């Protein structure tokens, strides 16, 4: 059994170093790192997709070559010539 002094020291130790400040286990740390990497990847993918969508007007398309991102291939008639271009 602990003495009163031992209990006071234990209580003081827990006040100074709470359990929540202990380092997390390896699995939780790895999961958090993976989540951070995935979020960073999603941000990069979103920026790339936005850039592709902004550049829809400069992309030509055919029946075999589609358009980037959410752009769609539309036909236009310029002075009798049919041209297919990607549009948002």
From Swiss-Prot:
Propeptide residues according to the Swiss-Prot or TrEMBL record: 22-49
Give a GO molecular function annotation for the protein: toxin activity
Q: Which cysteines are joined by disulfide bonds?
A: 56-71, 61-73, 67-86
Please provide one cellular component term from the Gene Ontology annotations of this protein: extracellular region
Its annotated compartments are: Secreted
- Supply the alphabetized keyword list: Cleavage on pair of basic residues, Disulfide bond, Secreted, Signal, Toxin
Give the stretches traversing the membrane: none
Q: Where is the secretion signal located?
A: 1-21
Q: Does the keyword Secreted apply?
A: yes
User: Tissue expression, per UniProt?
Assistant: Expressed by the venom duct.
Recorded domain comment: The cysteine framework is IX (C-C-C-C-C-C).
Task: Please state what the protein is called.
Answer: Augerpeptide Hhe9a
Q: Which organism is it from?
A: Hastula hectica (Sea snail)
């Amino acid at each position: 059994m602990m003495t009163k002094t031992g209990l006071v020291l234990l209580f003081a130790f827990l006040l100074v170093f709470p359990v929540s400040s202990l380092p997390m286990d390896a699995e939780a740390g790895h999961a958090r790192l993976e989540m951070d990497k995935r979020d960073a990847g999603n941000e990069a993918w979103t920026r790339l997709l936005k850039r592709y969508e902004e550049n829809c007007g400069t992309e030509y398309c055919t029946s075999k070559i589609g358009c980037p991102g959410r752009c769609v291939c539309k036909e236009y008639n310029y002075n009798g010539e049919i041209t297919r271009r990607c549009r948002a």
